[in-house]
């Protein structure tokens, strides 16, 4: 697991005869928009052991420094996740097909969503306790029901992606919210701090 970007390079080179990578540069900037790899075996994050790859999103060129061109397009952004998981057994004793949750989480990074969990595990890497671990796909929600039932995007995730424009509440009143997965509606309440506000949604 020490060179996951090389795995992506090798996989893409093996697939190059069957895939025209030039079709996957939607904005025509000379860079393949994204590659997603499902790798065989287990995920280190799901109990697979330290020799397994930890599912992640990264970059072949701007991250790992490999200058690889396929069909005239540079290979860069990628994400990956595992075929199997040890979470389902409960005690890590057996392998099962991995749920879709971690795929949804890692693929959402390629849309531009950040992690919402404490990424350095020392309460300084972006901890966001207000999101409720299980309700945010980019926090720990990808592990709901062992990864088989990830949550819908929440209000902040939808706002970042441009899928939701929260309505600002500026006066007292009675307000109604439908479940966010039905119409993407959320409310916003500003605070005295310029860069801080609350988002209200119905899950």
What are these model-derived regions, one by one?
Residues 1-14:
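Surface-exposed, low-complexity/disordered Ser/Thr/Gly/Pro/Asn-rich loops and linkers
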Residues 12-17, 30:
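Propeptide (latency) domains of metzincin metalloproteases
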Residues 17, 21, 113-116:
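Alpha-helix capping at helix-to-loop junctions
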Residues 21-34:
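Acidic, glycine-anchored loop motifs typical of Ca2+
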Residues 34-36, 40-203:
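Extracellular hydrolytic enzyme modules, especially secreted metalloproteases
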């Amino acid at each position: 697991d020490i060179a996951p970007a090389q795995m992506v390079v090798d996989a893409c080179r093996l697939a190059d005869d069957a895939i025209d990578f030039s079709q996957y540069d939607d904005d025509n900037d000379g860079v393949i928009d994204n590659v997603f790899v499902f790798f065989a075996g287990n995920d280190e994050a799901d109990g697979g052991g330290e020799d397994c790859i930890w599912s992640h999103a990264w970059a072949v060129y701007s991250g790992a420094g490999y200058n690889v061109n396929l069909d005239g397009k540079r290979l860069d952004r990628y994400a990956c996740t595992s075929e199997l998981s040890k979470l389902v057994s409960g005690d890590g004793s057996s392998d099962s097909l991995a749920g879709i949750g971690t795929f949804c989480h890692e693929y959402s990074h390629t849309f531009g969503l950040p992690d919402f969990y404490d990424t350095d595990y020392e309460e300084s890497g972006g901890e966001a306790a207000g999101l409720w671990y299980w309700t945010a796909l980019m926090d720990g929600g990808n592990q709901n029901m062992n990864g088989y039932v990830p949550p819908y995007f929440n209000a902040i995730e939808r706002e970042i992606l441009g899928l939701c424009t929260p309505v600002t509440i500026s006066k007292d009143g009675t307000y109604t919210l439908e479940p966010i997965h039905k119409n993407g509606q959320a409310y916003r309440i500003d605070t005295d701090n310029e860069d801080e506000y609350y988002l209200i949604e119905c899950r």
